[in-house]
A protein has these predicted regions:
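Bacterial Sec-dependent N-terminal signal peptides
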Residues: 1-22
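Thiol-based oxidoreductase modules, predominantly thioredoxin-like and allied folds used
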Residues: 22-25, 63-103
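A short beta-strand-turn-helix
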Residues: 24-41
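Short active-site neighborhood of thiol/selenol oxidoreductases, capturing the structured segment around
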Residues: 36-51, 76
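Structural micro-motif
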Residues: 40, 95-124
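Detector for the c-type heme attachment site
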Residues: 54-58
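A short, hydrophobic beta-strand/beta-hairpin element that forms part of a small beta-sheet core
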Residues: 76, 109, 119-135
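Thiol-/selenol-based redox modules, centered on thioredoxin-like
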Residues: 127-151
Length: 151
């Protein structure tokens, strides 16, 4: 009997560790309407063609520690840098950029946040008042990313 209880407890504990946490991504349109929050905003700037963006999804954002931190302390936002959404952020209206030479247009919000240092993936952290605090460029491994998110 005692052995069965120990086995059952181990199964529950191991199952809890194996179960992965997923980031609860929001759209920029929904997040931009958020008011009276104490959480920071975290924005993942990506494109559909970006291999390193897909690797971040697969390896970094799927990490349970990273996902837990993002869900608990941030409003996590996925933003397609070549998308066509229109929204207001911190009293500014942003729209799809203008396509040049048939290339996909970079959204005006990307230019506003990243300036002339546009690259993917890139990440931005804003305070609850939607003012930019930090930009993080490029691929980052899960353990390093968790440390960045704590600070």
């Amino acid at each position: 009997m005692k052995k069965n209880i120990i086995i059952a407890l181990l199964a529950v504990l191991i199952g809890g560790f194996v179960q992965s946490q997923e980031v609860k991504w929001q759209s920029i349109e929904n997040a931009s309407k958020t008011e009276n929050t104490t959480k920071l905003y975290f924005i993942d700037f990506y494109t559909n063609w970006c291999g390193w963006c897909k690797r971040m999804d697969r390896e970094t954002f799927s990490d349970s520690t990273v996902a837990t931190i993002l869900n608990k302390y941030y409003i996590p936002i996925k933003f397609n840098a070549e998308g066509a959404s229109q929204f207001e952020w911190n009293s500014h209206t942003f729209t799809k950029g203008i396509s040049v030479n048939g290339r996909p247009a970079t959204h005006t919000f990307v230019t506003y946040v990243l300036g002339n240092k546009i690259g993917y993936p890139s990440f931005a952290i804003f305070n609850p008042e939607k003012r930019l605090l930090q930009v993080i460029p490029g691929y980052v491994k899960a353990d390093e990313f968790a440390q960045i998110l704590w600070y």
